[in-house]
Amino acid sequence: MCVMNKFGFVAYLICAVLMFSSFDLQKCTDALQKAYEDKDYKAYVNAFPNKYEDFVNVYGYDSKNRQKKVLYDVYVEHLCFLFDDDLVLDDSVLDKLLNLSYNYIWDADAVEYVIMRTKQLLLEHPQRMTEYFSEKTDGEVTSFLQMALTCLIPEDQGYLSKYHKLVETYTPYSNRIVQCLKIALKRAKKASDALVVY
């Protein structure tokens, strides 16, 4: 009979949970690539990473080690596929973008592309985004907006004009979203100030 002490049992449980809940990079990249090649939007969204860290591990670039991530070379095609479909306005896709927004940090390439397209989505579809945000908490709305406002140089006039355009766009729709935009701008600036540029 095998006797396991409490510490051993707890360690076993932690390992088991991590093994079954951890992000499977290979499985994700294979599923994304297949869905993209098949032009299967729903399968692509299903396979799309749920966390910022996982997204970067799939489409990012490790500038410290000068190393491309698995799907770095196809990030433009893949992300165009995600954003160019009318289904990008479905809750399932917007929820994926919301999940990405937690701990979102500015970076070039794929990360910057998502920021740019999210901002465009907000500007072009205020009614739909207002409906979507009505079902979310202030914290969730602020996080989503902060992702769209994340940048390298927050004092840039082009950046500030986009922020003012968002405020102008959402003023007729929702005072709540305008207030969340103000909070998101402060947080995005604070996050940008903390960036270390190599």
What are these regions (language model features)?
Residues C2-A11:
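Bacterial N-terminal signal peptides that target proteins for export
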Residues V3, S22-F23:
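Compositionally biased regions
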